[in-house]
């Protein structure tokens, strides 16, 4: 898979030009980075989801933060759009950065749990999607 960060584009512009199918959230709480583990996986990843038909990216972001993670207070901001190519298909996503200030009860979702780390995992074997998530993480916290 190949990740391409798309620069110089606003959130409203990207939503008008391409069909966004995924959102990814690089989150921090109490100066620690948030990662999640999916059921059945022993690796970590950035929180994210597919944008379902009829849903806009703002609703998908809220679904991730509130519905999947149990976040009750946050400040989220658009970072950039990105594309992921698997050799034949291209999918577009939006990267957000979120400052989490309050958490509620962890909902029953497809996640095993939420993990807070001082630094991102160094070893690629600890990431579910090292070819994309590591670069998205770096982009989110570079700015």
Task: Report each predicted region and the residues it spans.
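A generic fold-level signal
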Residues: 18-20, 28, 88-91, 109
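Short helix-capping/turn motifs at alpha-helix boundaries
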Residues: 81, 94-97, 124-131
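Conserved Nudix-box catalytic region and its N-terminal flanking loop in Nudix hydrolases
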Residues: 28-68
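Nudix hydrolase/Nudix homology domain
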Residues: 107-143
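Active-site-adjacent beta-strand/loop module that shapes the phosphate/pyrophosphate-binding cleft
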Residues: 82-106
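Acidic, metal-coordinating catalytic segment for phosphate/diphosphate chemistry
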Residues: 1-24
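A short coil-to-beta-strand element that immediately follows conserved catalytic motifs
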Residues: 71-80
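Short loop segments at secondary-structure junctions
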Residues: 30-32, 99-104, 119-120
